[in-house]
Amino acid sequence: KTTTAGSISTESCSTENILTKKEGLLQDSIQAMKEKLRQDSIQWEKQLSAVTIKGTRSQFRQKNGGIVARISGTSLEKEPTATEVLAKLPGMFKDKDGKPQAFIGGAPEIYINERKVQDYSVVENLPVTQIKEVKVIHHPGAEYGNNVGCVLLITTKKNLQGLAIVENSGFLFDSYVSNNHDLDLTYTHGKMTYYGKLGYANWQGIWKEQDIATNYVSGSQAGDNTGNNAGNNATTYIASATLDCKHSYNDHFYWSAGADLALTEKQTIGVKYDGYNIHQPMPFKMTSYAMTNDHVDDNVTGDNKFLYYDWQHHVNAFYQGNYGEKWKLNIFGDFVKLHTEQGQFVDEISEKNLANGVSEEEARNKFTLLPQSDGTIWGAKARANYTINDKQTWMMGAEYNYVKSESRTDYTPADKGTSTHSITKENHAAVFAEYSLDFKPFSLRVGLRYEHVDSRLDSHAPLHRKYDNLYPSLLLSHQSGRFSQSLSYRSSETRPSFQELNTGTVYANRYMRQVGNSQLEPSQRHEFQYQASYGDLFLQASYTYVKDYITSIIEPYSDDPQTGYITWTNIDHCWNWGSFLG
């Protein structure tokens, strides 16, 4: 106690009493705290019982220079076909033939579980429910050929033990009813997996197209169909052809079988065989006319027909293995045998010839044109990946392809055109290497590819060409939360196809022929691309400079300016830019 004088005095009490009082106060405090926590807990449970916590996981993510799209468990899994899934990926759309196409890179090169797809029907008949994810690569690195502008890597779900039987059927109601059916069997027992597929598709429809060519001739100077007049006194020649098919159908049989063996947990081997047979008749009505200035010179009508017939056999073998924590090795081998026919049955009659007094039989132009080819492809590819550390990786590999094709074009009767026969052979070898560095928030990928190509065309005008080139590539990426962006550069080359080089003449219609150009040079491409994404938003922009750009043109025939020739030529250079936001 404190007195008024400020002195201090204490009451007499024992140490034991003090401790007893403290313990009592402590116990009371603990009990009060427990009761308070219990009441709070009850109150929180009541409040949380009415609360649902939701999280949103992005369907797309950036990974190693590509965009990985989850398919399983997302809205994309509800799409009717794999084609619809691929067409809805960032930067992709569906072209007029119903196949996925990149807005900037063109037709993609597609892989399923790292196996290259040789025939697109394999993708068409892949059940959507079996797709786990798809990686879209809009700036391919050194591993891929210089003619590849986009890559799609499809990963499927793992097979479970036991037998799985899947039957898929589909119907399309349009001008006609189309349908497709396939039966898919998979059996997994221990380390072995066996699988097979058998399918049939019938597609029916109508189509119509029109071709118009305009040629300008002034004296001995000829223009072209670009609209560039040869002078004020030029004569204008116009030729037009309309093809109208009222009923086209496609019978498509396809099949596959294979087996995979897991040698160990980290090593797998497998072999797969697949094939198809396609028969597609396309009868159509052909109407065409020719004009000189404003005067109609002739009208031609015809009941013509296209007949396409293709078959293919493909065998693939592979080995995939991991060695320790750093090495990964993939080896693939392919053999392809294929046959293609593109028959054309022509039965045309000219009003001009009838007006000149000739008989209907003499005025009729009737013949059969049958281009066909048989091809063989051998291919092998090996790729090794080495993890230097958690920030650096190294990839290297090599591939070789041998292609042989024998083509011939026959006219019946023989006097209706010039028959051709040619044999093409191509040896294509490549080695590639790529280094990746991750220094967050940035990552860098640098690649270099070397290609050697030896191609030979044996025909009435033999051609032999060799190409040896280096193709560098660079990719710089940045990641910050849900926002990612990348800048890339790639050098590549587009070589002319044998169709573009072959100087044999092919009949297109009454006023149009096709002939190749043996003097074509390869096109050199330099592409810069910027890509950005935030969540599910995607932006893509590119600029491409092309030296010796290959393009098709229509030139007038010297003896008949109303008849045009579709051919190909090199333009000194061109550039283009494109962008996509979605």
Language model features: what each stretch is:
Residues 113-140:
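Short acidic/polar hinge/loop motifs at secondary-structure boundaries
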Residues 13, 17-19, 50, 82-85, ...:
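N-terminal periplasmic accessory domains that precede
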Residues 72-73, 161-185:
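Short strand-turn segments of transmembrane beta-barrel domains in outer membranes
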Residues 176-204, 208, 222, 235-283, ...:
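Transmembrane beta-barrel wall of Gram-negative outer-membrane proteins
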